[in-house]
Amino acid sequence: MKRFLLASICWAVACLPLFAQQISKEELLFLTPEWKGERFPDGRPKVSDALLKRMRRVTHEEAWAVMKGQNYKYQYAEGWQVINPDSVLVGRALTATFMPGRPDVHRVIDKKGHEKDGRVKSQNAWPIDMLVKGDVYVVNQFGAHKDGPTIGDNLGNSIYAKTGNGIVYEGAIRDIAGLKEIGGFTSFYRSYHPSHHLNNPDGELNTTLVGINQPTLIGGVMVMAGDIVLGRDGAVTFIPPHLVEKVVTTSEIVRLRDMFGHERLRQQKYTPGQIDNRWTDDIEKDFSQWLNAHINELPVPKEQIQEYLKKRTW
């Protein structure tokens, strides 16, 4: 009997996020303890706009190397179709998780949303109403294709107006021509279908919203609300907020060292072997002098270069 009771309690605790639907501030704080910076009122980590701007130049390789070194091995998702494939998508994740529609669950979620939580319209609009500038809407639509799309050009325009960004969508979208016309709606999605989702629990139903800002699964990655989305070159990397500054700073240092190395190779001052291997003290000193001489011309903020130079001994 005690074993049964314990199992029941564990099951209930495990299901709390589902019944609560939107994650509580307390739970979000519990799941993101390594983030010590600013947060939104609901507890979502708020990485600064300045870091988001610098993140736009980071490559997947640079982000991957830093995160792998911190034992974060499953942060990269590939195999997407892309709107604006030559653009870069960067922002703070706001997540939504859908499951195949189930009438009884759908009804109680609708009832709670409309009567207790102040939600309006259908469930697919609820997370969108929460978006703010700099967010990226990240959706687990369980790969739904036909009758699966919850986003077309109407909601796409609303998302872009609120965030200035596109989306990451584990499923099919619709109105692809209209979404492309938005211009800056750089998005990563699995497929396209002209149909739309069905959300009537008393009629046709195929999708139910079960989580807002809960941990969700996107392409083999556990995505947390507040993770930084880096979408470029056909793939998406999700960076935990407490690693963002390290990723950005490392990327900038690598970028500067590459620029210096390439310039010196063109000048034939050093051999490829000297540049590819650990730099000697003389090369490091030359690099510091080069940074000082070009500090106003480099694609890294002057303040960041000055901070970097303070820590160098050459």
Where are these regions (language model features)?
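Positively charged n-region of N-terminal signal peptides that target proteins for export
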Residues: 1-4
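Bacterial N-terminal signal peptides
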Residues: 7-17
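N-terminal pre-domain segments of enzymes
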Residues: 21-64
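Buried hydrophobic positions in well-ordered alpha/beta secondary-structure cores of metabolic enzymes
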Residues: 43, 159, 227-229
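Structural motif
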Residues: 44, 215, 234-236
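Feature captures the catalytic cores and cofactor-binding loops of soluble hydro-lyases/lyases
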Residues: 54-62, 66-225, 238-282, 293-304, ...
